[in-house]
């Protein structure tokens, strides 16, 4: 029997992905480790034939069938061709030299990165003519979730009033530990797990002490949580101990969910997801017939490499060519620049914002001043109690006074029976846990943590009052303590505040652009709510209330977009993944739903720009009728690959047909994205874009430009005319600079408008008069 222990740290590990720490990655064996041998587009429709060809290739390398069989980890045979195998470095180099091999990718490990969201985004079921009801809530769509598994008993997987399984579904439910096919129904229609590559590196995982279930069942609730957000069924009367009350539902509440488990728990607080297992899951999902793939996973940006060595990007490319939109998390390494992950231009990459909701926690000081902090505190009121600031706690160094991290060395006499104020430079998610533990252990009754906004709230163990404020409010409280002989404070339980005056912000943890791999490709693409999202979890998870929990991260924003993509695909089944992305990006809000400026949380807080949120905050209803789209097909992706230096042989194998790159090499600026990013402007640059009409046949659009500061932007022609015979029209954009020095990025926009639609793309331009120059001054 496995020991399925529960710990707060398990929850914390999945709230934030891409935290920049890779120390948990296992060391490879002395002789061999898992490599992905990628062969490009499959050359045969019979999957058994494809797999046999993989074994023959490995046999020819290793010299015997037995060694080939023992080395093989996965065969990719549906969406594309390739395999994962345990190889030494010399074997990997030898097989990489074979002409039929596109490239060999060393296995790497990724990490896993509601009641209000959908009303906030204007996607309410009460409007009979909106996107939800026009698509029957996505009933014929299948959303593939590649994550940490699922808790099938959750109410969000009920199949009440849902019709038969869509006819294009070809997948199934695999049995395993505490999971069998009876756990699937007309909502949860598929469940598989992929562990071979993980086990190749973590052979001891099979021991009885392993936390996780070797099956589609998830030990931690991360996979269940993201599945809820994307396509969970209606569950009324939910809340977290009275906070955020309402009905939990997914973006496409009647869509079907197929779960592909690739993430496994190594320890109480660590999960790892092998890129080879992820790639195998994507291959199976393509075969099974999913319409959308949602991956709340990521890795630090692969700075020295291109997307050819990124397993998710490789699988996503083949999925997109087969009409499947792939939605991925931007990552949680913000607010620093150039931290965005999942940067391949065929992936829809998602940043995270707050909602128009907060959990205010009133604190009344002895001078009757009420401070509204933030917390998820659902305990009883703490009546007027002594308030203390630990001055110089047991150390002669005054710089330690009042710091949350030094509360451990304070005497119990200072904090016992009191509420403690402390200051921190650490991320809130770390400091609050430590400070609450120290104060509670010393007999304190509550803690107020002053620090930089972190956008990550979670309750403290045993409903201990732990309230967050910023430095300004913390300093006010400190002045009150120092100016009063007997300072006191009263802490009331948290309350849910919705709507105005709560503003929308890009979360501080959300990873930022510019794109560190290919600067001319704007990332992230779009933003969606991802802060304090209430959704389902496993019942053994700390901080759950009746199987529901708050989590934050771009992990939560990603399935929000996945649910919207499912609805758009149901409404427009002929739209390509690129057309769907364009519709989402060009119709996004650049202000919040109340018309107010969206800010980006950071140091300092600033107005949000395209490197924070891409096109803006997703606007689902507007995306149904974008008017025009910036579409992409195979030829466009080939242009991109030629422009960034893929060799012709690799491109030919990747796309399954002979390819010759033009000379001179095309510019990546010509790639038909719903954005224009010019990272190195010196001389005037002219670049093309093509728009496809998906609105009224007879349409006339006129251009309006907001040029980035210090640039001149000219569009030719200034008017686009569409009719029954002209559905695609191209235009050119010329950009020049008036700056006399190297600059940072400035931002603007380009909008095509008729009487019904505004088709807006962001402009991001940096002047570089001295090219290839790093300015550290």
From Swiss-Prot:
Pfam families from the UniProt entry: fn3_6, Inhibitor_I9, Peptidase_S8
Domain Peptidase S8: 117-624
The keyword ATP-binding is assigned to this record: no
PROSITE patterns assigned: SUBTILASE (PS51892), SUBTILASE_SER (PS00138)
PANTHER family: PROPROTEIN CONVERTASE SUBTILISIN/KEXIN
PA domain segment(s): 386-481
GO cellular component, as recorded: extracellular region
GO molecular function term, any single one: serine-type endopeptidase activity
Positions annotated as active site in the UniProt record: 147, 222, 555
Residues linked to a glycan: 133, 180, 206, 237, 397, 412, 540, 647, 723, 758
Similarity-based family: Belongs to the peptidase S8 family.
Gene source species: Arabidopsis thaliana (Mouse-ear cress)
Protein's name in the database: Subtilisin-like protease SBT3.7
One of the protein's GO biological processes: proteolysis
Prosegment residue ranges: 23-113
